[in-house]
């Protein structure tokens, strides 16, 4: 994509998503994600009713009387966007590509973050870590992120969510809120990595998918190509049995995915490319309040 085209698209996305974050998500984002981390504030003398687990034994020994550590809600968050850039995101049959919706959702979350004085960073991943953008504040930083979202060219077309989660756990030393934006087509189990990551951080899953992945249209013979492996096959979509089998496969896959999120205690939301992601995000925020 030419530089002028990229800049034009960056501007278009900024106008749309910044408006959403300012006018619709302002209070919702704050209440959904603020106050989930605690930081040390001060030490004071023990008072009746204080939790004995908060006693600072070093200070207590020094002054020969019990002192406790006082914590307060962290006033700013570090937000990480974990963006799937594998080949399957370059797919879309209705309205827009999955990649385009992921870009808009990521930009909306980014503007919501800086509006609340939070730092925002990005992990682009396929079956490897493609790029890590360290968390920072500011509009200039957000515009750089949007530009990367629009024009990023991954080295690999495959996906490995487990690897991305392990990277998050290792590279982010302090607690953060991490949004995974993916179609979650990855077949490899990532439940253990997700559980471990969510113990250290606040992980939220955002699934973006195309309607034709869940429901095949009855259009006769159709050639299907796996965007990640390149494997092709022909199927007869005029057959009700074929369409039903595909639908059953999708339902089973979604059931397993939702089970993974539930067992890992991770909030998740799914949205189709022909649906309104604003409503999906508002539902997610409401779930967390």
Predicted regions and their residues:
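Short, flexible loop segments at the rims of nucleotide/cofactor-binding pockets, characterized by
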Residues: 58, 154-158, 181-182
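Short, electropositive alpha-helical surface patch
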Residues: 132-147, 259, 286-287
